[in-house]
């Protein structure tokens, strides 16, 4: 019987290295090997020869030790704490720093588990070390893959060869390696082996700051320290209560606002140079960007992100995106990002089955798979997933100076039965449908954001009546600063679509949102969701002929700006777009050559400036003290009126006529004696309205109306909204 000799431990380790399956390279490579094995071991598969290079000393050739291995048996005559390797690749010499001489360059527990610190340590970080009086710069890589049997760093620098740079298994499920001399802009990925040694698809860095597009989807090294910010004045502005500020958001998709001459994307810098002056002119206070975190599928609009820490490279580098934010801030414009913590796509290079296990999602599809979106749901019951997401939110505030996040699809996270039949979901521990893990995550995230960035704001896109979304966590709420008022959007659009003849039968639809208008801190949103998938453009939602459609839209926008709540318009609303939004094109800028559309653009501009200038229109947006009905239930005329107030007692009267019938002598009761001065009329000539005669100034009369002793006799144009400012004299 033939006896097979068992390979030595050294040979076993070489076999593992050759299969990119070695988890403990620092025990076998570099200068820290057992003394009986030699002074230094190098792993350089494909090299012909390797020599040790120490400054001030003669080169020492290393002995070959198996295929790809080289060893220095006796180093007693050498003194060094830093060395290089002269590697002969088929006659071509390359001088390299050996990564395996840099031992213990990692991070403490708190740095790896505190969200505010994690993005300064995880992923690819540029660091500089001192060795023998010399500074050695390079990139330290840390990745969390607790169930992987092995992990290698691969990239253009090692010809994507997983054998070349095995990473060290560290504590807490983290793998690490430091690569000296690696420049910025280097492509890299991770090559992992699953729990049973099985090969996995090459993975992009979950913490990567920069990424390439199709087909490689590789992560790219990026140094956050380089960009020189110019927004100090903005960053140092006093902390203010956002609920009392005028907040007018311009929702924008970067790839389709405008295109270049040949239909190409504008990059972040080109976009900033054109967009910022436009936002200032139009009176918007903030731009809200649809998701810019790296996403492989452009048609997802960013709502299927893979690289949560990287602004998409479709439009430029992270520095270019910083320039965009910087320029906005220098012009007094805040930047809000759509943030997607609800789900992630199944792309093989992403988070899906990252280490060969469902590391970021629940393996049970009843909790881990979103059947509507064909994507995985983050498992918020796991601490590392919660930390990852909270760290990501903080990262955008700190590293890119953003001012807010709008959290997408909050309802889908709060309810375990969201969009599921009775047999497709698992109840919580109490038998209910609330997702306790999501609730806890939102509370933690909001507390962290407001603790570290007091001037920030968080906004929830939440479509249900879940209580306390924008209430502080110490009062039992989720802690968001604001919530989109989806009910107002749905009801008001449902009403305005009706023919004016029929609107009197739907009057309650218009007035009902005021019953709950102050139950949350609301943003009135006319978002991208309302102008896609056959829903038609806002203009073409309006009934009637061309004149009535345009007048309806003007009246509706005026009504919106008079209502309590912050304002959000999707790009193109101000143009009166006739087409639905198309992410493969650009807005219909040519429409502004027609007065019908130019008038709407001027109206939105003036509404924004009016909203900012009149504290009565914004200071108490989230406080019932700032709103009083003047005419609520005149369904037959389809006219509504209310007053908005500020803390100082200033008042603005808002009247909307939702029919094409003018009201020539319209008496309206008001509570105070004085004079009302016209501020804005959506039917005015400059907005391409009918310019129906209205009073510029009107004084109260001691004639009772609507239960009030004082009243005004007004002229109200057809399909129009009027704003009047009250004064005591």
Swiss-Prot record:
UniProt xrefs under InterPro entries: A-amylase/branching_C, Branching_enzy, GlgB, GlgB_N, GlgB_N_E_set_prok, Glyco_hydro_13_cat_dom, Glyco_hydro_13_N, Glyco_hydro_b
GO cellular component, one term: cytosol
Annotated disulfide bonds: none
One Pfam family named in its UniProt record: GlgB_N
Catalyzed reactions: Transfers a segment of a (1->4)-alpha-D-glucan chain to a primary hydroxy group in a similar glucan chain
A GO biological-process term: glycogen biosynthetic process
EC number: 2.4.1.18
Active-site residues annotated for this sequence: 408, 461
Keyword field contains rRNA processing: no
GO MF assignments: 1,4-alpha-glucan branching enzyme activity; cation binding; hydrolase activity, hydrolyzing O-glycosyl compounds
Ranges annotated as spanning the membrane: none
Protein name, entry field: 1,4-alpha-glucan branching enzyme GlgB
Species: Vibrio cholerae serotype O1 (strain ATCC 39315 / El Tor Inaba N16961)
């Amino acid at each position: 019987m033939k006896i097979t000799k068992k390979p030595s431990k050294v040979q076993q380790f070489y076999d593992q290295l050759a299969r990119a399956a070695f988890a403990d390279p620092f025990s076998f490579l570099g200068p820290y090997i057992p003394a009986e094995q030699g002074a230094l071991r190098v792993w350089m598969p494909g090299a012909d020869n390797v020599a040790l290079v120490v400054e001030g000393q003669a080169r020492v050739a290393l002995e070959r030790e198996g295929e790809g291995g080289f060893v220095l048996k006796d180093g007693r005559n050498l003194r060094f704490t830093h060395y290089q390797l002269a590697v002969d690749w088929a006659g071509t010499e390359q001088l390299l720093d050996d990564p395996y001489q840099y031992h213990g360059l990692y991070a403490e527990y708190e740095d790896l588990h505190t969200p505010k610190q994690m993005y300064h340590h995880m992923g690819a970080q540029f660091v500089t070390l001192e060795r023998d009086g010399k500074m050695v710069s390079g990139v330290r890589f840390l990745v969390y893959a607790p169930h992987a049997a092995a992990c290698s760093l691969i990239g253009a620098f090692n010809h994507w060869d997983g054998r070349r740079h095995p990473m060290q298994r560290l504590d807490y499920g983290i793998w690490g390696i430091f690569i000296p001399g690696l420049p910025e802009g280097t492509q890299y990925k991770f090559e992992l082996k699953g729990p049973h040694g099985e090969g996995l698809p090459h993975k992009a860095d979950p913490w990567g700051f920069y990424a390439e597009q199709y087909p490689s989807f590789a992560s790219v090294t990026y140094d956050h320290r380089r960009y020189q910010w110019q927004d100090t004045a903005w960053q140092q502005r006093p902390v203010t209560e956002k609920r009392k500020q005028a907040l007018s958001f311009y929702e924008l998709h970067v790839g389709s606002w405008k295109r270049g001459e040949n239909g190409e994307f504008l990059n972040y810098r080109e976009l900033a140079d054109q967009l910022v002056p436009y936002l200032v002119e139009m009176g918007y206070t903030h731009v809200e960007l649809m998701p810019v975190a790296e996403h492989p599928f452009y048609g997802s609009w960013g709502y299927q992100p893979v690289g949560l820490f990287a602004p998409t490279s479709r439009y430029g580098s992270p520095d270019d995106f910083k320039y965009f934010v910087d320029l906005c801030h220098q012009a007094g414009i805040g930047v809000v990002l759509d943030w997607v913590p609800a789900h992630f796509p199944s792309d093989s290079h992403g988070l899906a089955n990252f280490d060969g296990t469902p590391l970021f999602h629940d393996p049970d599809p009843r909790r881990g798979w979103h059947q509507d979106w064909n994507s995985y749901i983050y498992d918020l019951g796991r601490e590392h997933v919660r930390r990852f997401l909270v760290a990501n939110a903080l990262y955008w505030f700190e590293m890119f100076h953003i001012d807010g996040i709008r959290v997408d699809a909050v309802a889908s996270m709060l309810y375990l039965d969201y969009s599921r039949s009775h047999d497709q979901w698992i109840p919580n521990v109490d038998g209910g449908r609330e997702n306790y893990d999501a609730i806890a995550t939102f509370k933690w995230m909001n507390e962290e954001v407001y603790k570290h960035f007091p001037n920030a704001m968080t906004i929830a896109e939440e479509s249900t009546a879940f209580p306390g979304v924008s209430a502080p966590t110490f009062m039992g709420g989720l802690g968001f600063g604001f919530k989109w008022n989806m009910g107002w959007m749905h009801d008001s659009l449902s009403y305005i679509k009706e023919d004016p003849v029929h609107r009197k039968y739907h009057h309650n639809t218009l007035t009902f949102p005021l019953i709950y208008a102050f139950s949350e801190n609301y943003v009135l949103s006319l978002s991208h969701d309302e102008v896609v998938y056959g829903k038609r453009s806002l203009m073409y939602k309006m009934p009637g002929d061309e004149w009535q459609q345009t007048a309806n839209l003007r009246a509706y926008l005026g009504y919106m700006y008079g209502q309590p709540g912050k304002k959000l318009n999707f790009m193109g609303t101000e143009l009166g777009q006739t087409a639905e939004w198309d992410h493969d094109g650009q807005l219909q800028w040519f429409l502004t050559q027609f007065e019908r559309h130019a008038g709407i653009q001027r109206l939105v501009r003036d509404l924004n400036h009016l909203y900012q200038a009149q504290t009565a229109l914004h200071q108490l947006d989230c406080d019932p003290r700032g709103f009083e009905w003047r005419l609520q239930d005149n369904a037959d005329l389809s006219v509504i009126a209310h007053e908005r107030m500020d803390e100082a007692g200033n008042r603005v009267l808002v009247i909307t006529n939702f029919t094409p019938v003018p009201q020539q002598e319209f008496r309206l009761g008001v509570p105070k004696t004085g004079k009302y001065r016209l501020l804005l009329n959506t039917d005015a000539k400059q907005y391409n309205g009918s310019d129906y005669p209205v009073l510029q100034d009107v004084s109260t009369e001691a004639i009772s109306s609507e239960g009030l002793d004082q009243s005004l006799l007004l002229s109200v144009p057809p399909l129009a909204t009027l704003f009047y400012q009250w004064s005591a004299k």
